[in-house]
Amino acid sequence: MYLTKEQIDSTAHLTSRQAARKLNVGKTSINKYRRHYAQYGDLKLPENARVLIIDIESKPLTGYFWGLWKQNIGTSQIIDSGGMMCFAAKWLGSDEIIFSSEFSDGHRDMVYKVWGLLDEADMVVTYNGDRYDIKRINNEFLKEGFTPPSPFKSIDLYKTNKVRFDLPSKKLDYIAELTGSGNKLKHQGFDLWVGCMEGDPEAWQTMQEYNEQDVLLTERVYIKLLPWLTNIPHMGMFSGNGTACPYCGVDSLVDDGRTTKTHVQEYTLYQCTNCDGWSRGNKPIGEKLESRTVR
């Protein structure tokens, strides 16, 4: 259930439990929206698009090798080719985080669950997912004999980070902390993966918390980067609203009299009061400049 800023503000004097009873929602929802409005203000999220945030964790390959330096390992030396061991996902703006692993569900059921989510999604948001997560997930579909899910638009925030900024680090943890979105969960390092591969329940609990935190960070960074995105579809098409903001899909564009110019034409410039994204009209102002010169 979506809660407006006015609803949350009306319960500011109440505890989370009391506010949950008043608004007939779970306490988790109250806490989530209080954090959301404290951080983002009255930012509205697209309601008609199915936007999936996802992150996977993989186990390493195991095999026979003769040393630690400059080894060429053939396919005949591979014992186990590794692959996806778990994933965490959530729908943008939802309270629920979906987690599945080999340990809790078995490999095939885990793969089936992630296939169903991707098949339902209009957009899939990842951090470095075009190079890693999506391809690794496709590996599992191929191994299990699944056909591809229905097409979706991939939004890789790593690419936005790389194209738009020149930060000292391209890691999710860095841009998440920089934007006030939080930090990755600290853990014991590679020993965590070893514990999971050995079936240690405590290791799997930590892995789940780590995986779920990455999904939350990815969602928060997505919201922070909304006005910077260059590879996002026009969000207005999901609601059928041609005047909606292309970035967030909310009908909140403002024309303050400014224009933007291409090489030979001029267009009205708009800014969204919800996400602050800039866009331009699709109808030129005045006549196209007829020039006898080129460059």
Task: Enumerate the predicted regions with their spans.
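Short, amphipathic alpha-helical "recognition" segments used to contact nucleic acids or chromatin
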Residues: 1-15
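Short alpha-helical "recognition helix" segments of helix-turn-helix
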Residues: 18-23
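Short, solvent-exposed alpha-helical "recognition" segments
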Residues: 30-46
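Conserved RNase H-like, two-metal-ion catalytic cores of nucleic-acid enzymes
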Residues: 44-118
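Conserved DEDDh/DEDDy metal-dependent 3′-5′ exonuclease domain
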Residues: 93-178
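Acidic, Mg2+-coordinating catalytic module of metal-dependent nucleases/exonucleases
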Residues: 125, 174-239
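Short, cysteine/histidine-rich loop/knuckle motifs that typically chelate Zn2+
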Residues: 246-250, 274
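Short metal-binding segments enriched for Cys and/or His
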Residues: 269-295
